[in-house]
Amino acid sequence: VGADLLAGSLIKNPGGGLAKIGGYIAGRADLVEKCAYRMTAPGIGAEAGASLNTLADFYQGFFMAPHTVSQSLKGAIFTAAMLEAVGMTTSPHYTDQRTDLIQSVSFQTAEQMVAFCREIQAASPINAHFAPEPAYMPGYEDDVIMAAGTFVQGSSIELTADGPIRPPYTAFVQGGLTYEH
C-alpha cells in the first residue's frame, strides 16, 4: 500500500481545529517539487510558502492534532453507542475497529434526518441559532443538509453532520474538538 503523491487539507484533522487555511502535499520528492512549482511559479517552488501570521496556527494545529483526533474518535464511539442504545442504526458499530472519524446514522424519514442535523447545529458553539435547511449543492443529485457551527469554515474535525436527502436517509456525523462537546 502506498502512494506516489498525496494532498490534504489542514482545516481537517492535521490542523487540529486551529488551522484556518492551508494544505499539504507529500510523496515522491520529484512530484512534490513539480507541485510546488505549479502552486507558485517556476524558480520559486517550495522556497515560498505560508505567511501572514498563519504559521503559528499550523504548528499549534499539528501539535494538537493527535489529541484532537482522539477526542473526535471518542465522540464518534459515544455517538454510535448512545444512538444504538435508543434503537437507531449506525455504522460503524460502536465496538468496531475504526479507520475514520465519520459516524453514519440512519433514519426512517427525511424529517428525522433534518431534525437530527438541526439539533447538531443547535449544540454548536457558532451559529447555533441557525436552522439548516436541505438545499441544492453542485455535485449532488439530491438536496443536501449541512449542520456545521464551526470556528473554521469547512472544518470537519469540529462537530458537523451532513448528508443527501434521499433514502436511505443517512447523516454523516464528524468531529468534535473535545469529547465533552
Cite the ranges covered by each PLM segment:
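Catalytic PLP-binding core of fold-type I/II PLP enzymes
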Residues: 1
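Active-site C-terminal subdomain of aminotransferase-like
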Residues: 8-113
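Receiver (REC) domain switch/active-site residues of two-component response regulators
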Residues: 4
